[in-house]
Structure formats: C-alpha cells, structure tokens
Amino acid sequence: MGEVTAEEVEKFLDSNIGFAKQYYNFHYRGKVISDLLGAKEAAVDFSNYHDVNSVEESEIIFDLLRDVQENLQAEKCTFNVMKKLCFLLRADRMSLFMYRTRNGIAELATRLFNVHKDAVLEDCLVMPDSEIVFPLDMGVVGHVAHSKKIANVPNTEEDEHFCDFVDNLTEYQTKNILASPIMNGKDVVAIIMAVNKIDEPHFTKRDEEILLKYLNFVNLIMKVFHLSYLHNCETRRGQILLWSGSKVFEELTDIERQFHKALYTVRAFLNCDRYSVGLLDMTKQKEFFDVWPVLMGEAPAYSGPRTPDGREINFYKVIDYILHGKEDIKVIPNPPADHWALVSGLPTYVAQNGLICNIMNAPAEDFFEFQKEPLDESGWMIKNVLSMPIVNKKEEIVGVATFYNRKDGKPFDDMDETLMESLTQFLGWSVLNPDTYESMNKLENRKDIFQDIVKYHVKCDNEEIQKILKTREVYGKEPWECEEEELAEILQGELPDAESYEINKFHFSDLPLTELELVKCGIQMYYELRVVDKFHIPQEALVRFMYSLSKGYRRITYHNWRHGFNVGQTMFSLLVTGKLKRYFTDLEALAMVTAAFCHDIDHRGTNNLYQMKSQNPLAKLHGSSILERHHLEFGKTLLRDESLNIFQNLNRRQHEHAIHMMDIAIIATDLALYFKKRTMFQKIVDQSKTYESTQEWTQYMMLEQTRKEIVMAMMMTACDLSAITKPWEVQSKVALLVAAEFWEQGDLERTVLQQNPIPMMDRNKADELPKLQVGFIDFVCTFVYKEFSRFHEEITPMLDGITNNRKEWKALADEYEAKMKALEEEKQKQQAAKQAASGNQPGGNPLQGAPASKSCCIQ
C-alpha cells in the first residue's frame, strides 16, 4: 500500500466531517486551547497590512479581552485596541479625544494622539500640559460629539466641519477621517478618530463596520474603568465626609480649629499635592472711627472686589497644607497680597463671584497670573488648580478652598469637583456650629453682665449694712475687719427679741413693722434655729443676704418683701411652734427657712399663665412652674455670691442636700402642683395616727426622706397661703392687697393681651370679692390647715383663723347677695308697676310689654 498524500487526507476529512470533528476533539482540542490561553500575544503579523482571516481575528479579539483583564490602566487598554484598529482599518494614525466639562463648558481634549500600528504608549499618551483642546463647535470631532453619530469624511478639503488647526500645529496633512463617538448610555464619553486611509482614497462602509464592532471593546474598557473610578471617588467622598464630620463635631467652638481639624484629617483622600484655605473677614459694617478718615477725605475709599453680599474681600488668615515631600502645615495670619496662594487672584475671584474654577493648565492660563517658576527649593510648580467657595447656611462665603496638582498628573475632573464641593459644602454648613456656639457664648456673657448689674443693685452695699451692723459707730472699722465675736455683740443689741415681736406666733402681723425691722426679724430666726454657730455662717454674709433678699423683691402691691418675710416667718413658726422641726435636721431647717424667704423674689405681680400668654422670656426658659423656677434661680444666684453665701462653710454633701431641699421647697409653691401632692400628704397624716407614740413616729419619719419632702412641700403651701389664717383685721387688709394685684393683672390682660380676665382678676367685679374668697377658702385652703391640725394639733390656731375668716367673708358675701337680691326685687317691682300703668291708660296698647317684632311693627 502506497503513502497517503495530504490531498487525499484533506479530501477524506472533507467527506467525513463527523469523524474529523470527533478525532480533533479527542486528540487536539485540549492542547490547542491550552496553547491559545498560554499565548502572551496574538500570533498575527502586524508588520505589514493585509487582510486577516477569521482565526487571526479571533486571536486579536481574545488578545483584547485578556488585555482588559490584566491591565489596570484605561489608556493602555484603549491604546492596544487603537493599534489593532489602525492595522484592521489600514489607517495611518488614530487619536482619542476625551469629553469633559471645564467650569461648566463642554470640550474635547486629546488623551491618546498619533497612535499607529507600531506605536509605543509613552509616545502617544498626552500629558495635561500638552493636550489639544477642541470646543464642541470646532472640527470634525466637535461635530461628532454634538451629533453623537459616526462621521466618514472622504475629503477633508470639501468638508465644512474640518479644521486644520491640528495640522498646522503638527505639520501633518489630514486627507480623510473616520470618527465615531464612544457612548455611555446617552452621554458622550470620548471621540475616537482614524485619519488617512492607506492604499485607498478614503475609508469605506466596511471600515465603518469594523470600527463600530471594535468600539464595543473600547466601550467595555471605558465602562469598567469608569465604574472603578466612580467607586474609588465615592469611597473617597464617603471617607472625607465621615472623617471631616467626626472632626467637625469634635470642635464646636472655633471655626478656624474646626476647619483645620477636618481638612488635616482628610488630606490623604484629597489626591492633590497641596491645598490652601483662605478665611474671609465676616465684618459687614465698619466702625465709625474707620469710616471717618474716608468721609473726611484723609483716606481713599475701598474700591476693591466685594463678596456677593457686599463685604470687602479680606483674607484674615490662610492655612497651607503641603502634602508632597515632607508634610507641612503653615498658618499665615493677615497674609500679604503676594502670598503664593493669593497672588494669582484666583481665590479673590472665587470669593467675589462664588463660582467653582477648574484651571486645567495653570502655566498657560492668561486670566490668572500663576507663578510659572518653582515656588520653593523643592522645585514644585503649579500645574492644575481647583478652587471653590466655602458657603454657610446663610449663603455667605466664609472662605475659599484651593487645591493644587492632582497626584496622577491629570487635571481635576467633574468627580474631583463633586468630591471637593461635598467637602467645602459640609464645612460651610458646619459653620453653623461655631456660629451658634458664639451666639450662645455672647448670650451667656450678656447674661453674666446683666446678672452682675442686677446683683450690684440688689446686693447690700457697705452703707446699707451699717444700718444693722454698725461697726463704724461701735468699733470705727468695716464689718470685714471685725471678728465674729464683735459682730455677734453688735447684732445682740440690734436684733429684736423673738418673744416680744411674736415672730414664732401664727398670728404674727408685719403691718406695724418697717421693712428694715422685718430684715432684723429674719436674721433673728436663724439664731433662734441655732444654725449660725453650728454651720459657721459668717454673720456679715447673713446680714448682707437678708438685706439683699429684701431688695430683690419688687415694689409691687402684694408679692413684695413683706409677703416673702411672712412666708419665712410662717415656716419658722411651723418648725418651732408647730413642732414639725422634730422630723428635720438642723441643715434641712436652715434650707427650708431660706427657701421660704426666697420663694417669691423678683415676682412681677402676674401669674404663670400671664407669662405664657404674653410670651415672656421666662416662659420660654422654663417649661413649667415658670415663676417658681425663676425665684429659685434668683435665690441661688445670690447664694453663689461669696459675700452673700450663707452656705459657704458647708461641706459638699451638706451643700448639695441644702440646695436639693430648696429646689423642692420653692417649686412646691406652684399651686398647680398642690392638687397632686395633697393626697400623698393625707396618707402620711393617716399613717401617723397608726403609731402608738410620737417618738416612734418621729423616728420613722426622720429616716423617710421622701415623706419628709412631701411634708415640707405642703408646709410651703401652708406658708404661702398663711395670710388667709391671720386675724380678721389683718386678713381683710391683706386680701385687698391680693385683689388689687389681681386686678392690675386683669387690666394688663384687657389692654395688652386684648382678652377678658377671669372674674377674680376683673376690676369690674370687685363687689364679688367676698364670694370669691369663700370659694378660694373652701376649694384650696381649708384642706391644708385641716390636715396639718390633724397631723399636729399645735397647728390648730391656723385652722381656727381660717375658719373665723371664712365666717367673716361669708357674712359679707351673704350681705352682698341679700343686697343684690333686694335690688333685683325692687327693679322687678318698678318694671311691673310701669307695665301696669301703661296698660290701664285709655287707648293703651295691651301688647306694650310684649317683645318687639324683628320683622314688623304695629302702627
């Protein structure tokens, strides 16, 4: 048998396709695929132009796919596609133009230029300072970007869109062009352009098909790398906002420190060599002494640029962050005009117009004068710049942030603008924190100043204290120069006797005494409680405190110093005469009497409801028990003054407990709380009756802090209402004072608030006062004193007093009712007589007394 020739084998395989396929799959398929995957490069001869078969084209496509997988640089992958397209299209050159917007204006810039089949990437990659930029209304590439359609120009000399601008720059003649847009959805990403068909007069329809087919790879490359870039940018953006946010909320007091902490922390995510922040002076109106020289012609008026809200542009501080080489931060107060970040005029322009400015090639910029030589010995030069305003919530420009030289050498793009704008916008909004803090700080300082003014006028001065502590008269020196024994000796002669003045009696009346005598009586109560020596209260401080309290009460009709003293005196009487002191420690008794004296200090003569209706600042400051909380704060303010602080020698625990008791006692005077606590007090009274001996009950109560506080709260109510228990000759006068103050509030409600007051505060219903007093006694007061007399029978005189006063008011109310009834009966008799007389007259109208019709009348 002879040898089989190649022609015979080929003929056999063509006739037996199934056998050929089976044999190939079994013996060669694995090896071929392995060799193909292991190949580093497509085995296609690119040295000369020729038509490629399907196998060679498959190798080219596979090579492109592998290139996309292995390369991390979009330009390199696109460059490889363009080299192969040059071969497939037989184009002399190809170029890639990237679509971008600069300062809101769309343009096309060269990214890969003069690519041919034998080109090297480094020769074709265009640096930012060498790029050629086309507006969209210029050249074939501009037309393609605008129309978003492929363009085949057979003869450039006959095409209306062709521009020889690049030919003149490169001394190259473009004869024909094939250009196509690279799209991402409906948006143009880039333009790819092939020029000068080799061996043929122009590009053909077949070339258009090849270009569009291979543009799928370019689209894939662009999308992959664009998504990767977007992911990187969003990651950086998130990190920037996260870290800057953490630093912004660390520093709430000062805008400079806030900006510095935030900007320094995010430096690694900004992807630039340097950035500079200029802070603007926020002064809108000059002081008169700065304006006078201008008005007098001695100094020229400011004629420079201004911010959109009219402020003179003055960078009072510049902070430079240098990130290349050795990191450095420079803070320049009052920077000179020739500072490297300001000399170009760009920050001033941004502050003036509030625009974002993206300078992609700073050395070639002609509007701003950037330094073209190195800035320092490091040789660093400005290449590209991104500058944007920092705007606060009021839309005021507070500063300008300028970023220099993107680290990869490319100019700043849209994503950089978005990222930097997010940072500056966040910083601008965060200015609200230091602004708010500054406003609060100013308010706090004003409050301290006004508080100091009030204390100056309220505090007992060195002349007033001599009315009680007559140290000059006795010793010829000031109180602070005297020993405590010397002060005690003077006070012993000045203070009234408790028994003779009856300051421990429930029927005590302040009417015969002067206000100074009431101050002396108040001081004496502290000695009667034996707390002065026990707690080492400085006697000068005690005198000054009581005198200052008397001055702290306003000169109003009822809630004045006399009322404040009476409440303190009743508290003293309940503790001493009413035997309630047995439940409380000496420290608590000290706090309770002090709270009683302070409980209505700086009262305005109007109640809590009026504060809310009139939108008084107190109502905004305190949500509930408005006036009571104000009285408490006023009293504590006096106690914070060293010269008035009668608690100054208490230890920390004692001081906290005393203030705690004062808090409860003064807030408890709010009658709105009275109805909540009286049931609890009644249960305590009932419980006291279950104990066999007073001693056991006392020991139990001394250990029950909550029950003691409830009893104290009810004691404050009993003290505040104690005027209703005084002898009739006193109570009747005080009731008129209370009513007069209520009527004054009613007048305010009628005139200021344009509202009708309730009957208790209506001056026009003054005759109903006895009836209102009876209702007040029955509804509010009787329960308090009835329960206290049941709790401690020593307090029964107060119940007797209110019972007697109710009889007096009831008698007056009945008298008034009888009088009104008699007047009404007399009026009815007169009307009846008038009607009878009218009906008996000749021709009289019998219907005269009937109500008149609204629709007709009888003639």
UniProtKB/Swiss-Prot annotation:
Q: What positions belong to the pro-peptide in this record?
A: 857-859
The GO annotation for biological process reads:
photoreceptor cell maintenance; retina development in camera-type eye; signal transduction; visual perception
Compartments reported by the entry: Cell membrane; Cell projection, Cilium, Photoreceptor outer segment
User: What Pfam families would the database entry show?
Assistant: GAF, PDEase_I
| Record-listed N-acetylglycine modification sites | 2
Segment Disordered: which positions?
823-859
Q: Where does a divalent metal cation 1 bind?
A: 563, 599-600, 720
Query: Which cellular component, as a GO term, is one annotated location?
Result: plasma membrane
Q: Which SUPFAM superfamilies match?
A: GAF domain-like (SSF55781), HD-domain/PDEase-like (SSF109604)
What GO molecular function annotation could you give as one example from this UniProt entry?
metal ion binding
Q: How does it sit in the membrane?
A: Lipid-anchor
Name the residues annotated as catalytic in the UniProt entry: 559
Cite the positions of S-farnesyl cysteine lipidation: 856
Q: Which UniProt keywords apply?
A: Acetylation, Cell membrane, Cell projection, cGMP, Hydrolase, Lipoprotein, Membrane, Metal-binding, Methylation, Prenylation, Repeat, Sensory transduction, Vision
PROSITE patterns the UniProt entry points to = PDEASE_I_1, PDEASE_I_2
| Listed Gene3D superfamilies | 3'5'-cyclic nucleotide phosphodiesterase, catalytic domain (1.10.1300.10), 3.30.450.40
Catalytic activity annotation: 3',5'-cyclic GMP + H2O = GMP + H(+)
Under the heading CDD domains, the entry gives: HDc
> Which family does the UniProt entry place this protein in?
Belongs to the cyclic nucleotide phosphodiesterase family.
Protein name, please? Rod cGMP-specific 3',5'-cyclic phosphodiesterase subunit alpha
Organism equals: Mus musculus (Mouse)
Q: What is the lineage of its organism?
A: Eukaryota, Metazoa, Chordata, Craniata, Vertebrata
What's the encoding gene here?
Answer: Pde6a
